[in-house]
Amino acid sequence: MIKVRRNRKDREVLAMKQVKMMSLNAREKDNALNEVRLLASIDAPNVISYKTAFFQETGNTLCILMEYADGGDLSGLIQKKKETKRRFSENFIWQVAFDILQGLRTLHDNKVIHRDIKPANIFFVGGVAKLGDLNVSKVMEGKYASTQTGTPYYTPPEIWNNQKYDGRVDVWSLGCVLYELAKLQPPFLARDFPGLSRKVTAGYY
């Protein structure tokens, strides 16, 4: 759950993400704490900035305060375009590509793979596109990772095939997002996961 809060000291508007820990399994709890660690370690213009985090014993809730995205997220913008039957301009698509590639460069330079690039995780602050939601991101300890994660429509072949992967999976996912901006639908569509997997691994769209 995301709420909007205002800092009492400087009146800055912030987003507060509330995670009810009691309702999570062990892996989900690790992901929530992982997001705090990663946000605190990254300071970049194209990554949503972290402010602080605290734990509310009442309700057993982890609260993460971060930069507020006044322009919402990309999934909301796509939905509006679908409703009005209008397209994004080419300049807008190029700007999103540039901004997010800058964010990915920062993450990858810090040996972090985002692993869940999708419209809902791309936010806009003052017109600038920024990466957010790092809860399934991973700090690379070696050359490759192998854990299956991500959102199916934007998941690259390596993960579908249970192969080892590196930061290039984020570039694949971004490519899927940019395709969706141009066509207003993801490049790979299917009725079920097996069908989606076959299309992605064959490169058939």
Feature-to-residue mapping (PLM):
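AlphaC helix of the protein kinase catalytic domain
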Residues: 75-87
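Activation segment signature within eukaryotic-like protein kinase domains
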Residues: 96-97
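Catalytic-loop of the protein kinase fold
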Residues: 108-124
